[in-house]
Regions:
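N-terminal pre-domain/capping segments
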Residues: 1-80
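A cross-domain feature marking catalytic cores of carbohydrate-active enzymes
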Residues: 4-8, 36-39, 59-65, 84-86, ...
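Alpha-helix N-cap and loop-to-helix initiation/capping positions
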Residues: 14-21, 69, 93-100, 127, ...
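Short Gly/charged-rich anion-binding patches and loops
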Residues: 21, 47, 69, 104, ...
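Acidic/histidine-rich catalytic cores of soluble enzymes
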Residues: 34, 107-179
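Active-site-adjacent beta->alpha loops and helix N-cap segments on the catalytic face
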Residues: 40-49, 90-103, 125-128
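Short, hinge-like loop/turn segments at secondary-structure boundaries
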Residues: 51-55, 72, 76-80, 101, ...
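Glycine/small-residue-rich loop that forms an oxyanion/phosphate-binding "nest" at active or ligand-binding sites
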Residues: 68-101
């Protein structure tokens, strides 16, 4: 499946959009869905999930107003992973502290049958290939939302990471990066 991370559209339109119109436009240009369904309540999550289904589209994970809600709603909607995303993943956070937070999130997600997956990203705690590999070694329960563009910009080799950690991939973000 090919989806799109619609974060850029949120930024472009300042968060002011109609989700049904957005999905129809994405479907018209060939996308199968988006990576994340973002919801503010259980009812909002169900309403938006029904909208995706009505259009024959899909999403991979659900983000709620807090980590626990995102995990629960992701599980309830039959999806398999959530992002490891919290205040403990900032660039200046100690690596061991970030790993401890991530391990707790992996346990919490695991109780719901969901994998917590690290998203490597410039400016975040896990940015370079070395940091990504150290993180995956330190937090063996974590899946991987591999961002090829950010890894390349950090000097890494996405193909090597895929070969080495294919069994931990939750999703891959493909980007066209000019180095």
């Amino acid at each position: 499946k090919f989806g799109v991370a619609d974060y850029g559209m949120n930024v472009w339109y300042g968060g002011l959009f109609d989700i049904a119109e957005r999905l129809e436009d994405l479907k018209a240009i060939g996308f199968d869905g988006t990576e994340r369904l973002e919801a503010v309540s259980e009812a909002d999550a169900v309403h938006k999930a029904a909208g995706y289904r009505r259009l024959g589209m899909d999403f991979s994970t659900c983000r709620g107003p807090d980590v626990q809600s995102g995990i629960r709603w992701t599980a309830a909607l039959g999806k398999s992973y959530v992002w490891i995303q919290h205040r403990g993943m900032g660039r200046d956070t100690d690596f061991e502290v970030s790993c401890r937070y991530a391990e707790a999130l992996c346990r919490a997600a695991g109780r719901w049958g969901v994998t917590a997956s690290i998203h490597n990203h410039m400016g975040q705690r896990v940015e370079s290939q070395q940091e990504l590999e150290e993180f995956l070694k330190a937090v063996p329960e974590a899946g991987l939302v591999l961002d090829t563009g950010h890894l390349s910009m950090g000097g890494g080799d996405p193909v090597e990471i895929v070969k080495k950690y294919h069994d931990r991939l939750s999703v891959i973000h493909l980007k066209d990066v000019y180095l």
